């Protein structure tokens, strides 16, 4: 069958399976929900009916030959990749599979200090040796930045035997390094470029966004579809570039070392549907998110004492670009640490932020944010300043 981006092969196969009224004498033991009515009442019948085991009509994640294979090919096309692997152990598994695919025990990898623990754990279990590059730091905001091209190039020169360079794109706070230039330099020295795009799904679909890994020519990227792409928590993509020179079979073998053999069809179908949604409507969705984030920034900055920062931070070096969908808010000029504002928002206003640190709170924006939710956040921040604000806590 010839599929287009308007198709969702896994979802479509699940719907056919559901209509067939198959009698299950396989796992899972809840048997379409009949074996656990309490769980069925909680999750709903549709969810329980499609929480099924691998079988011929539904393919097998460990060795896909039909609908999962077709869904992965559609995702690769949508993201401009050579291959795409559906991951159900989270982007942690994607990051670890990237590192294990290109490095072996004793190999060096050039990597920023502010990497996710998944990358650290991958190096621990594999025996890969890190060559750390310190990211820049904004001392007023107290946040890590990207890597300077000069520092990456020096690390490459000092470690010509390194196998790969690892880049965050973007960071939690929306900061992007000069990914194109880093990729160009790394490739000139025979090194692979691995990109943690856990917070960068939207970079593949929005206009005027920071460059994504595949467009920049990187070799592999770990993409958290569930963070900003609308799939279910724990679902992720692992992308391999068209010119990476890394075989699909090799990467699949690495993935199968650690990924479950019981791939959840709830997670798989959510990846399939989210890919379809963004492939067909992504430009409009991303424009909506940017508009919402920009409005929130403007209104928050009007309050006074808060600083919701954006691309005015860009310096062409360790802040080469800024992801405007990230709503990062500096709080210390109202006399409160970010974590204090985070706790007050949660405990007193029932507003759950993504994180709070010593100087900032972060809101993750998506197409699911409503204008009234943004107004509620702005109003809460204004009231927090009035009720709890103190003399400025000063700079970090």
Language-model segments: which ranges?
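Conserved PLP-enzyme active-site core in the AAT-like
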Residues: 10-15, 19-21, 39-42, 63, ...
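Generic alpha-helical structural element
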Residues: 3, 64, 225, 260-263, ...
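N-terminal "arm"/small-domain region of PLP-dependent enzymes with the aminotransferase-like
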Residues: 1-66
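Structured loop/turn residues at secondary-structure junctions
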Residues: 90, 115, 170, 332-333, ...
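Conserved C-terminal alpha-helix-loop-beta "cap" of PLP-dependent enzymes
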Residues: 295-396
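Conserved N-terminal alpha-helix of the aminotransferase class I/II PLP-enzyme fold
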Residues: 48-93
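Short glycine-rich or small-residue beta-strand-to-loop segments that form or flank ligand, phosphate
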Residues: 58, 85-87, 165-168, 328, ...
């Amino acid at each position: 069958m010839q599929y287009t981006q308007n198709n969702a092969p896994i979802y479509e196969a699940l719907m056919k399976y559901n209509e067939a009224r198959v009698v299950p004498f396989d796992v899972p033991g809840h048997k379409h929900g009949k074996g656990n009515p309490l769980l069925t009442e909680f999750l709903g019948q549709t969810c329980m009916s499609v929480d099924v085991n691998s079988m011929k009509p539904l393919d097998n994640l460990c060795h896909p030959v039909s609908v999962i294979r077709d869904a992965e090919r559609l995702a690769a096309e949508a993201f401009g990749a050579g291959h795409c692997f559906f991951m159900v152990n989270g982007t942690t598994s994607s990051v670890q599979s990237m590192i294990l695919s290109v490095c072996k025990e004793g190999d060096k990898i050039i990597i920023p200090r502010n990497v996710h623990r998944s990358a650290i754990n991958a190096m621990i279990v594999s025996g890969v040796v890190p060559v750390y590059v310190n990211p820049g730091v904004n001392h007023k905001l107290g946040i890590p930045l990207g890597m300077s091209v000069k520092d990456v190039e020096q690390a490459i020169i000092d470690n010509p035997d390194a196998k790969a360079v690892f880049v965050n794109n973007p960071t939690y706070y929306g900061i992007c390094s000069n990914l194109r230039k880093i990729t160009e330099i790394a490739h000139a020295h025979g090194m692979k470029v691995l990109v943690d795009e856990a917070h960068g799904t939207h970079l593949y679909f929005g206009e005027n966004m920071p460059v994504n890994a595949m467009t920049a020519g990187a070799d592999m990227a770990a993409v958290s579809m569930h963070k900003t792409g609308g799939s279910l928590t724990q679902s992720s993509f692992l992308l391999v570039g068209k010119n990476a020179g890394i075989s699909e079979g090799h990467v699949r073998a690495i993935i199968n070392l650690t990924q479950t053999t019981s791939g959840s069809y709830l997670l798989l179908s959510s990846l399939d549907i989210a890919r379809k949604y963004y492939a067909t409507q992504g430009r409009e969705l991303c424009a909506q998110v940017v508009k919402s984030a920009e409005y929130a920034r403007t209104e928050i900055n009007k309050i006074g004492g808060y600083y919701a920062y954006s691309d005015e931070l860009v310096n062409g070096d360790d802040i080469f670009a800024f992801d405007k969908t990230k709503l990062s808010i500096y709080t210390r000029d109202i006399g409160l640490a970010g974590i204090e504002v985070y706790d007050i928002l949660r405990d007193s206003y029932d507003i759950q932020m993504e994180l709070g640190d010593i100087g900032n709170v972060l809101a993750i924006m998506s197409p699911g944010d409503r204008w009234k939710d943004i107004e509620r956040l702005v109003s809460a921040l204004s009231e927090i300043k009035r009720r709890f604000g103190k003399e400025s806590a000063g700079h970090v």
